[in-house]
Amino acid sequence: MRTENTATLNLIWGALILEELARIGVQHVCMAPGSRSTPLTLAAAQQTKLKRHLHFDERGLGFMALGLAKASRAPVAIITTSGTAVANLYPAIVEAWLTHVPLIVLSGDRPPELLDCGANQAIVQPGIFAHYAKQINLPTPDAHIAPQALLTTIDEAVANQTRPVHINCMYREPLYPSELGVPILDTESPYLKPLQTWLQLSRPYTQYGKYKQVSNPSDDAIMRFVHGKGVIVAGTLTPEQDPQQLIALSQKIGWPLLTDAQSQLRQHPAAIGNIDQLLQHPKARNLLQEADRVLVFGGRLLSKRLISYLAEQHWHSYWQVLPEQNRLDPSHNAKHVWHANAAQFAALNWYRSSSANWANTLITYNDELHNLFVRNIDHGEFGEAQVVRAIANTRPLEQQLFIGNSLPVRLYDMYAPVSCCTATTYTNRGASGIDGLLATACGLAAHEGKPTSLIIGDLSQLHDLNSLAIAKSLASPLVIVILNNDGGNIFNLLPVPNEQVRNDYYRLSHGLEFGYAAAMFNLPYNQVDNLADFQDSYNEALDFQGASIIEVNVSQTQASDQIAELNLWVKQS
């Protein structure tokens, strides 16, 4: 009787946790198979308010949850068993912490008496994510602990969290009930009697108000700030911040808007999108050096040239707007940081600058670069930048775009085309790893249900190869565009002192192609070596209800040679 009560109470605790998370706003739960997490798994299987996603690899599962959370703008739960299964979530948790994405890890664990004694699959799990997650340690389910205490623990742990939370759940055996019939929380268990009112409602047990510290400048401070030559910089901005409002702000003040690849504004015709290249354009750089005020929205800028410009310029006033308490300035400039949503800050009572339109010549220089890229990239040899520009120009309102790290995101930042409308753009630029990129894109696609394009390098795809199993399960279009230059050829752009050392220790040429990987997971596959074939394959893939792969094969030096050629032209302008 006692062991059956243990299994039932385990299950009730699991069900209470999942029910409360659903009421708090969790829409998705990502699950990996395992025995010690059985009370959570069985509870999730019965939970009708959550959409379930399953994958055998916890590393990919964590990144899929990251993509789901980015797309849904809501926390996502992850269920794993004990041991190294939990540790495999670490890369995704780090990325989520750095970029303020809320993930909730529910890890099954052994009870205290089975730790540090040689028991199977038992490690010390509390604190495994160091300072990259808020830590909550639940005891083993106990009838002497009121269910209200469990609910308030969950509520406090998750309320107003914009970063990962790790809830470690210890369970004693038996883990499996003798039968699983009616919904767990519909039982006549005396343990649930104190929750009868809560069970009849749909709201969380404890409702926390939204806590958001907002700081705004006074009208007088704004008037003084705009009295001079300034620039506005759009860094990493999420879609819910409504970055489009920065266009109107730029036009109202009369200062140029310099846009990063992650700003949602990189391709906007009213922005100075080619800022990375303009900073090596002699006339443009000389003009930009006249600025003495800067208004930065967001952080995590991609362009080293833009970062250097912000570091080297002597600013009279430096303002940065961030939605969360954070330090996002590797140059450590003296500044005033305002805590606000970008759109809300842009809607303040701004005045026309006394030096409005001081940098209008930048528009001419920006247009010159646009024409250069059309001639030399769009109508030049087939290559990586040409493919990136083609993707960015194709049906942008119909799809969302996830750009992989290393060379792909830099090509987009340097050469993205001007467009009247752009796709919602996502990246993983917190820790900027090349792991989990496909899995993240799968999470984006799984939530939105709209066409999603992933631009990914060959090493990044090899790193996340088994996430093709997640891609295979998708019902909406996911176009996986692999830029295969046979290794880590971003190192062609870095000052490695010896070519042999570059190839042996950095580039790691592999000679692999992805046709057999596509066949293994039964995914449509095309290999292309010219723009016309790519565009045909790409448009077809956007209409396919599921994942497909397009492999773009180029030489190891195609992109780096083209970058060097374009840099030379820009510097001589």
Swiss-Prot record:
It comes from the Bacteria. Pfam families: TPP_enzyme_C (PF02775), TPP_enzyme_M_2 (PF16582), TPP_enzyme_N (PF02776). Its cofactor is Mg(2+); Mn(2+); thiamine diphosphate. Its EC number is 2.2.1.9. The keyword Magnesium applies. InterPro entries: DHS-like_NAD/FAD-binding_dom (IPR029035), MenaQ_synth_MenD (IPR004433), MenD_middle (IPR032264), THDP-binding (IPR029061), Thiamin_PyroP_enz_TPP-bd_dom (IPR012001), TPP_enzyme_TPP-bd (IPR011766). It catalyses: isochorismate + 2-oxoglutarate + H(+) = 5-enolpyruvoyl-6-hydroxy-2-succinyl-cyclohex-3-ene-1-carboxylate + CO2. Homodimer. Catalyzes the thiamine diphosphate-dependent decarboxylation of 2-oxoglutarate and the subsequent addition of the resulting succinic semialdehyde-thiamine pyrophosphate anion to isochorismate to yield 2-succinyl-5-enolpyruvyl-6-hydroxy-3-cyclohexene-1-carboxylate (SEPHCHC). PANTHER family: 2-SUCCINYL-5-ENOLPYRUVYL-6-HYDROXY-3-CYCLOHEXENE-1-CARBOXYLATE SYNTHASE, PROTEIN PHYLLO, CHLOROPLASTIC. This is 2-succinyl-5-enolpyruvyl-6-hydroxy-3-cyclohexene-1-carboxylate synthase.
